[in-house]
């Protein structure tokens, strides 16, 4: 396994991968074609995840968000095509492509993006563009690609943003937990082990080629308010909940339909929300 990363966040160190004997770490930027080519050498599979993520980070960096996603994906696809031996190229997209209201959405449903000029949607727009790039590299050049749209991943070792990650950190310190507006936004949370199972299936199943898959756990749907209460309860924390105004665009409802992934990948999320939070807290 070879990982190309800028190391701007200590994601690998937090997960213990920086010293794993089966992992080779290459420091580089996906926007630098030479770095991508060096990382691609000798590889059979590509899992392309490089991007800026997290609403707060995207709001502050809308231009780099789009540049890294689009330029980075173009570099990765061109390199993979020229490499000539890639068995599967998996492009990580996002559930954000479904916009502000997404109930039981299927892969073929029309995507819905926000108004031009609203910084939040730069991430979704760029990811939708990378999906089109990946699919058309398959259609036009025969590169065996597929795309995954993950719905709210969480788990141990997570860095950066994400509600469960933020809530867990504060709950363990008995610090107040901030909730945007009334906390009535609904999300479906998918534990990291289930996401990994889906990735492995997408790598190894021929049916995945040329397809896009929603990957998530509709059974773990909950409001942000009740999620915060659940984290506090499981952590046996003394944290209080604070409601803070949020004036930016937000997603009110996001729950996936994963029937396609069940049929073609054999995917079904196994870890329920309570168990996942317990493992994340451990």
Task: Label the predicted regions.
Residues 1-150:
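N-terminal Rossmann-like NAD(P)+-binding domain of SDR-like oxidoreductases, especially those catalyzing
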Residues 19-23, 108-114, 141-142, 168-179, ...:
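A short C-terminal helix-loop "cap" of Rossmann-like NAD(P)-dependent dehydrogenase/epimerase domains
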Residues 35, 75-79, 189, 194-197, ...:
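Conserved mid-core alpha-helix of short-chain dehydrogenase/reductase
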Residues 81, 138, 172, 203-204, ...:
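Protein kinase-like catalytic domain
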Residues 122, 160, 192, 220, ...:
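Amphipathic alpha-helical segment in the mid-to-C-terminal domain
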Residues 128, 146, 153-166, 175, ...:
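Glycine/proline-rich active-site loop of Rossmann-fold NAD(P)-dependent oxidoreductases
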Residues 192, 212, 223-226, 247-268:
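Conserved C-terminal active-site "lid" loop/helix of NAD(P)H-dependent oxidoreductases
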Residues 273-282:
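Amphipathic terminal alpha-helices
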């Amino acid at each position: 396994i070879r990982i190309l990363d800028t190391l701007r966040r200590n994601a690998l160190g937090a997960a213990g991968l920086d010293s794993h004997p089966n992992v080779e770490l290459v420091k580089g930027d996906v926007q630098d074609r030479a770095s991508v080519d060096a990382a691609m050498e000798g590889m059979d599979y590509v899992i392309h995840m490089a991007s800026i993520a997290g609403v707060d980070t995207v709001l502050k960096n809308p231009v780099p968000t789009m540049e890294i996603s689009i330029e980075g994906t173009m570099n990765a696809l061109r390199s993979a095509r020229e490499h000539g031996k890639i068995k599967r190229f998996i492009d990580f997209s996002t559930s954000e492509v479904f916009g502000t209201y997404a109930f039981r959405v299927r892969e073929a449903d029309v995507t819905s993006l926000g108004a031009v000029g609203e910084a939040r949607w730069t991430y979704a727009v760029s990811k939708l563009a990378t999906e089109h790039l990946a699919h058309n590299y398959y259609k036009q050049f025969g590169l065996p690609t597929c795309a995954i749209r993950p719905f709210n991943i969480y788990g141990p070792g997570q860095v950066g943003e994400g509600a469960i990650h933020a809530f867990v950190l504060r709950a363990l310190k008995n610090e107040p937990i901030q909730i945007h507006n009334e906390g009535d936004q609904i999300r479906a949370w998918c534990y990291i082990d289930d996401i990994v199972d889906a990735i492995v299936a997408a790598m190894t199943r021929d049916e995945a080629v040329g397809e896009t898959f929603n990957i998530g756990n509709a059974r773990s749907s909950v409001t942000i308010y009740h999620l915060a209460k659940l984290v506090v309860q499981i952590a046996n924390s003394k944290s209080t909940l604070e409601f803070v105004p949020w004036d930016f665009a937000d997603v009110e409802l996001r729950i996936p339909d994963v029937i396609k992934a069940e049929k073609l990948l054999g995917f079904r999320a196994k870890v329920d929300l309570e168990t996942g939070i317990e493992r994340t807290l451990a």
